[in-house]
């Protein structure tokens, strides 16, 4: 999928843990499924993350009803049978990849090519992602 995160999933009305559709296929590529997990982990903020990391996303995952990153990794391994021993590589790569995407959007915002005020702090988000990627290992 290449952009797997909560706001790209539609959940069942009868069971909020049952995904019924995945949206936003414009960046879809073939590849290692662990790339989706690594990418998603960058949108998943734990309550113990520093404030810079919390800038990265607006996903509401710090509430008590959502699992922590480590729990997601374990659940993913259990459900897929995939080896997640090297997940930090995918997590770091996902952070760098997302930083590049946000930098492109921030550049366009600074040049006046887009007016959406949500992009005004993307420079800080880019720096937070680069710092995260550098500190994962």
Model-flagged regions — what are they?
Residues 82-94:
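All-alpha amphipathic helical-bundle segments outside canonical DNA-binding/catalytic cores
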Residues 1-35, 39-41:
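Active-site acidic catalytic loop and adjacent metal/ATP-binding pocket
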Residues 10-21, 55, 80-85, 119:
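Conserved NTP-binding catalytic cores of kinases and kinase-like/nucleotidyltransferase enzymes
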């Amino acid at each position: 999928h290449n952009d797997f995160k909560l706001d790209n999933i539609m959940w069942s009305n009868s069971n909020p843990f049952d995904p019924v559709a995945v949206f936003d296929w414009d960046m879809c590529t073939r590849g290692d499924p662990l790339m989706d997990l690594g990418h998603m982990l960058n949108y998943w903020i734990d309550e113990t993350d520093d404030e810079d990391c919390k800038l990265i996303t607006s996903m509401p995952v710090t509430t008590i009803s959502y699992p922590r990153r480590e729990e997601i990794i374990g659940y993913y391994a259990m459900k897929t049978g995939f080896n997640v021993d090297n997940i930090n590589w995918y997590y770091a790569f996902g952070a760098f990849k997302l930083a590049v995407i946000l930098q492109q959007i921030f550049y366009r915002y600074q040049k006046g090519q887009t007016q959406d005020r949500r992009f005004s702090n993307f420079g800080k988000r880019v720096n937070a992602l680069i710092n995260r990627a550098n500190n994962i290992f």
